[in-house]
């Protein structure tokens, strides 16, 4: 399928909208009440620090809603205002934040049901309005909705669209797209649908397995077993690892994406030589600015003397998880929570999700005596949620 031609055709359809409806002022107050915070603005103005008795709060200097998320949420609110009585669907969570998605449900936005990991579009009919979330949607989903006669409101983050353009360039020039991402993440599913031949690698370990195979050190059967669900149909590692282009899920750890790119560049240079490198390796920068800014701010935050650190964001949020990884790598006592409700003020305990583990509850969350708490949040977390966490910390510190 010529995905580039399909996108171009869809963008010219009268039933497609990716620019909003000119109702920003009408929904501004709703958005401000639901997501913004005066306290957070005050803390920003005070050098990202707050002192309250024995409590010192240090905020990361970049956190919370990114521009792409703000745009997607605002467009969803505008869509409901523009279509007050039409049946309104969304193909997935608008962003990985439970409170934001709950607000959409309260606005009678229907979420496409999922049965055993497969989306069920049978309830969507001609004339329905369907929102594509910030992560985007697969080209097959777009095609289905277009053929069904739906009105499509596309809130896909422009940074995600940039990655789609990159893998389409790989496809055009017969390069295999090596995508650094999580194979089941909505964004990676969408990106791979625009690619031709592709392979998804999760981390440096998987990238090294691919590098070893390229250099003749791997076993074909073991390789195919490892990547059976992370590659394009008919993928042949002996044929499809000769010409590579690197792309990424925009929320992955920046330093890891860069290192994976360097690994493949060095490998192709070693195998084919400098004269032919450009025939075997393509590099594009698809790292999201907002992701990079939040990770850089987190690295600065963990350099400060902190007693503990709270990371706020959806448990299925990739960018939030990577912020938590940075804290863990520094040995800081840290807690990943998805909502302020995870903090129990009556018992001074916190329910949180350690990396790659199930939820657990820790007692004596806020220690006695002077305490410095670092706080950051993922790109899908509104300031209002961060404010609620800080207010709980303030009350706990008074006891």
UniProtKB/Swiss-Prot annotation:
Cofactor(s) needed for function: [4Fe-4S] cluster
Catalytic machinery residues: 187
Binding site for [4Fe-4S] cluster: 66, 157, 288
HAMAP family listed in its UniProt record: IspH
Metabolic or biological pathway, per its Swiss-Prot or TrEMBL entry: Isoprenoid biosynthesis; dimethylallyl diphosphate biosynthesis; dimethylallyl diphosphate from (2E)-4-hydroxy-3-methylbutenyl diphosphate: step 1/1; Isoprenoid biosynthesis; isopentenyl diphosphate biosynthesis via DXP pathway; isopentenyl diphosphate from 1-deoxy-D-xylulose 5-phosphate: step 6/6
UniProt binding sites for isopentenyl diphosphate: 96, 185, 317-319, 380
Entry's Gene Ontology molecular function annotations: 4 iron, 4 sulfur cluster binding; 4-hydroxy-3-methylbut-2-enyl diphosphate reductase activity; metal ion binding
Native source organism of the sequence: Synechococcus sp. (strain CC9902)
Binding of (2E)-4-hydroxy-3-methylbut-2-enyl diphosphate, residues: 96, 185, 250, 317-319, 380
EC nos: 1.17.7.4
InterPro entries linked to this entry: LytB/IspH (IPR003451)
Coiled-coil annotated spans: none
Name by which UniProt lists this protein: 4-hydroxy-3-methylbut-2-enyl diphosphate reductase
Chain sites annotated for binding dimethylallyl diphosphate: 96, 185, 317-319, 380
Family to which this protein belongs: Belongs to the IspH family.
Keyword terms of this UniProt record: 4Fe-4S, Iron, Iron-sulfur, Isoprene biosynthesis, Metal-binding, Oxidoreductase
Cofactor note: Binds 1 [4Fe-4S] cluster per subunit.
Role description: Catalyzes the conversion of 1-hydroxy-2-methyl-2-(E)-butenyl 4-diphosphate (HMBPP) into a mixture of isopentenyl diphosphate (IPP) and dimethylallyl diphosphate (DMAPP). Acts in the terminal step of the DOXP/MEP pathway for isoprenoid precursor biosynthesis.
């Amino acid at each position: 399928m010529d995905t580039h031609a399909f996108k171009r055709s869809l963008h010219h359809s009268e039933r497609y909208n990716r620019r909003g409806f000119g109702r920003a002022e009408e929904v501004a107050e709703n958005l401000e009440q639901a997501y913004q915070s005066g306290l957070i603005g005050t803390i920003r103005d005070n050098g990202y620090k707050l002192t309250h008795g024995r409590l010192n709060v240090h905020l990361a200097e970049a956190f919370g809603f990114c521009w792409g998320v703000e745009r997607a949420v605002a467009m969803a609110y505008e869509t409901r205002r523009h279509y007050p009585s039409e049946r309104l669907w969304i193909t997935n969570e608008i962003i990985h934040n439970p409170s934001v998605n709950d607000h959409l449900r309260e606005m009678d936005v229907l979420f496409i049901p999922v049965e055993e990991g497969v989306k069920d579009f049978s309830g969507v009919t001609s004339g329905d309005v369907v929102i594509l979330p910030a992560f985007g949607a697969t080209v097959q989903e777009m095609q289905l909705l277009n053929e069904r006669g739906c009105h499509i409101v596309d809130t896909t983050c422009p940074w995600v669209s940039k990655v789609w353009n990159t893998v389409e360039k790989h496809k055009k020039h017969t390069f295999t797209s090596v995508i650094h991402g999580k194979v089941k993440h909505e964004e990676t599913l969408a990106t791979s649908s625009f690619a031709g031949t592709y392979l998804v690698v999760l981390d440096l370990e998987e990238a090294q397995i691919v590098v070893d195979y390229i250099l003749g050190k791997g076993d074909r059967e073991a390789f195919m077993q490892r990547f059976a669900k992370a590659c394009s149909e008919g993928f042949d590692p002996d044929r499809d690892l000769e010409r590579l282009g690197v792309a990424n899920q925009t929320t992955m750890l920046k330093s890891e994406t860069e290192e994976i790119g360097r690994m493949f560049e060095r490998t192709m240079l070693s195998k084919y030589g400098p004269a032919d490198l450009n025939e075997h390796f393509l590099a594009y920068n698809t790292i999201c600015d907002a992701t990079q800014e939040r990770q850089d701010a987190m690295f600065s935050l963990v350099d400060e003397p902190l007693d503990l650190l709270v990371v706020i964001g959806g448990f299925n949020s990739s960018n939030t998880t990577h912020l938590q990884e940075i804290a863990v790598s520094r040995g800081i006592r840290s807690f990943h929570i998805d909502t302020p409700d995870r903090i129990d003020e009556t018992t001074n305990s916190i329910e949180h999700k350690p990396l790659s583990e199930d939820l657990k509850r820790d007692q004596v969350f806020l220690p006695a005596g002077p305490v410095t708490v670092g706080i950051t949040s993922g790109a899908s977390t509104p300031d209002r949620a961060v404010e609620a966490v800080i207010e709980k910390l303030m009350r706990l510190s008074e006891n």
